[in-house]
Amino acid sequence: MLCLPVFIILLLLASPAAPNPLQTRIQSNLIRAGPEDANIKTDKRIFAGLLASILKPIIDAAKG
């Protein structure tokens, strides 16, 4: 009869300590993933627009 409460207490203590397999798999995938895997690709139009907005005033000032 004493075994049942001891078993329940051990079960309650052990269950929060067990890692969530889905969470650990996602974390390991994110650690190994590169920018290409995470769809973090640079958009050439953004860089072209930024460079144009930065360089155009410099070129215009140099010309005139």
Curated annotation (Swiss-Prot):
Tissue expression pattern = Expressed by the venom duct.
Compartments (UniProt record)? Secreted
Per the record, the domain of life is Eukaryota
**Which intervals of the chain form a coiled coil?**
none
Maturation-removed propeptide residues: 20-43
What keywords is this UniProt entry annotated with? Answer: Amidation, Cleavage on pair of basic residues, Neurotoxin, Secreted, Signal, Toxin
Report the leader peptide range: 1-19
UniProt key word Secreted: yes
Q: Which residues carry the post-translational modification Lysine amide, per the record?
A: K63
Choose one Gene Ontology CC annotation of this protein and give it: extracellular region
Miscellaneous field: The mature peptide does not contain cysteine residue.
Q: What name does this protein carry?
A: Conotoxin VnMLCL-05
Q: What is the lineage of its organism?
A: Eukaryota, Metazoa, Spiralia, Lophotrochozoa, Mollusca
